[in-house]
Amino acid sequence: MKNIFLHSLSLENYRNFKNLELKTDNTPIILIGENGSGKTNILEAISLFYPGRGLRSAKLANVCKTSEDHCLVKALLQSKLGLAEFTTQFKRSSNRRITEYNESKIANNELSKFTSMVWLTPHMEGIFTSGSNDRRKFLDRIVYNFDPKHAELVSKYEYYMHERNKILVEDIRDDNWLKIIEEKMADISNHIANNRLKTLEFMQQAIDDLENEFPKADLSIDGIVEQKILNGKENIVSFITAELYQTRSKDKLLGRTSFGVHKSDFLVKHQKKNILAKFCSTGEQKAILIAIILAEMNYAIKLTKIAPILLLDEVFVHLDDKRRQYLIEFLTGLNMQLWVTTTNLEGIENFANKAQLIKL
């Protein structure tokens, strides 16, 4: 099994840190400090070495230290391809982010070729009651760990969708180019939808197989394209192309694409109660979310033989003793690099004895 882990992390002008240097190894790491000390900022910096905008989905201008034009995050990381140096930097003046692998520029969506990462934050605990966009992105992040090429597909789809919207809204008379774009969107959509369905099948099996102290969930996806595939419809690409063609006039008025895999919703049910997670209590929602994360970790390791980095922000807060103890035993048994934030060690003393403590 390959372990993805950080050997070192350097921050320059990042959030509240002017300069920070951390040396780590493939063991659990506990970041301990008062609220506002920068614990979550460190997790966010690590998450930037995975496709997307990090665990906060922050705008570039917000990650640089106040009054500074640039910020830099550097990591020496044991990746899927071996030991490598990764850097990502931002400049307010250009509003650009540049990511490098061993001093060679790479696209953000290429990061899943090198790293594997899972995170859980307090913000995510509202994912079941927020908009479908958050849930869909959560599902796609899970897919990245099973299929690294999925991130590139999602990025390409969003690019072509933006191009289509531009042609329609600006009334650019180029039916040829529009047809090509819609055909590309249709082909990519087919791959995205199938990847999601395949991953959900893996995940459901993982949830059903894993006996733990957290409630089991039933996972599904509510999307026209995914449903057509499940129903055995043939010529999916032709179907999507036709739908995009038929919605041109409507989308021109709306200024957006009204049909496609970007409209799908990730649905989660409390298995025992047979109700959607959004109707469960906040405590149950957190427990269900943890159960999904545990299943993802467990199955990703079994299926891909790669242990990702796990980032947990205040995960032990509001957990009862039984669930806290189970979670600690599960996590320490995974033999992977785990980053945990906390304001104190109460209730996790035994876990702390096996971890590297970093006080902020």
Curated annotation (Swiss-Prot):
Pfam families: SMC_N. Belongs to the RecF family. It is found in: Cytoplasm. This is DNA replication and repair protein RecF. PROSITE patterns: RECF_1, RECF_2. The lineage of its organism: Bacteria, Pseudomonadati, Pseudomonadota, Alphaproteobacteria, Rickettsiales. One of its GO terms (molecular function) is single-stranded DNA binding. InterPro entries: DNA-binding_RecF, DNA-binding_RecF_CS, P-loop_NTPase, RecF/RecN/SMC_N, RecF_2. It comes from the Bacteria. The RecF protein is involved in DNA metabolism; it is required for DNA replication and normal SOS inducibility. RecF binds preferentially to single-stranded, linear DNA. It also seems to bind ATP. ATP binds at G33, E34, N35, G36, S37, G38, K39, T40. GO terms for cellular component: cytoplasm. Keywords: ATP-binding, Cytoplasm, DNA damage, DNA repair, DNA replication, DNA-binding, Nucleotide-binding, SOS response. It comes from Rickettsia rickettsii (strain Sheila Smith). The keyword RNA-binding does not apply. Gene3D superfamilies: P-loop containing nucleotide triphosphate hydrolases, RecF/RecN/SMC, N-terminal domain. Its main location: cytoplasm. One of its GO terms (biological process) is DNA replication. SUPFAM superfamilies: P-loop containing nucleoside triphosphate hydrolases.
